[in-house]
A protein has these predicted regions:
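Residue-level signal for nonpolar/aromatic packing positions in well-ordered secondary structure
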Residues: 4, 23, 45-46, 50, ...
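Ligand-binding clefts/hinges and TM-proximal coupling segments of bilobed small-molecule sensing domains
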Residues: 18-27, 31-35, 72, 103-131
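Paired acidic/hydrophobic, glycine-rich loop segments that form the ligand-binding mouth/hinge
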Residues: 12, 33, 51-56, 71-73, ...
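Short loop->beta-strand "edge-of-pocket" segments that line small-molecule binding or catalytic clefts
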Residues: 2-18, 31-32
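Beta->alpha turn/N-cap motifs
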Residues: 15-17, 37-38, 54-61, 98, ...
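Short helices/loops that flank or line small-molecule/ion binding pockets
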Residues: 3-6, 25-26, 38-58, 66-67
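Alpha-helical elements of the RecA-like P-loop NTPase motor core of helicases
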Residues: 2, 20-21, 42-43, 61-62, ...
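Periplasmic-binding protein-like
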Residues: 57, 61-103, 121-131
Length: 131
């Protein structure tokens, strides 16, 4: 977002987070300020003269509910795709079984149900795997 990546803007991020790495590589004009953790981003943002707090939407939504006067920008600046894997020495059959398990869990609604059961908001189930 050009409004965020502007000279004079400080963007507070959780130190060592995936979005810290992403923004470190992509921000050209704004400065990054690293909070001790992702949970500390908004408190660090509020305690200083910072312009932007960046983080995981669920955490920022919880902070916005806790602190009046905060607003979330629409959209997102990155997506973290989750994955499962196996050691290289596992058989092709093991790989196929894992792939089948994951695809079945997504298609059957098990993943969506687990997200709902655990009150996880602001996320979506990945589409079917390609190829």
């Amino acid at each position: 977002n050009a409004q965020v990546d502007a000279p004079g803007n400080d963007i507070v991020v959780g130190k060592g987070s995936a979005y810290d790495l992403y923004l470190s590589r992509h921000i050209q004009h704004a400065s990054l300020v690293r909070a001790a953790s992702s949970q500390a981003v908004v408190d660090t943002f509020l305690s200083g003269n910072h312009q932007v707090a960046a983080g995981v939407r669920q955490q920022l939504e919880a902070d916005a509910a806790r602190v009046p006067g905060l607003r979330l920008l629409p959209g997102r600046f990155m997506v973290i795709e989750q994955a499962m894997g196996l050691p290289r020495n596992r058989s092709a059959r093991a790989e196929a079984l894992l792939r089948s398990f994951v695809e079945h869990a997504k298609a059957s609604g098990e993943v969506a149900a687990a997200l709902q059961r655990n009150h996880v908001q602001g996320v979506s189930v990945a589409p079917p795997a390609r190829g």
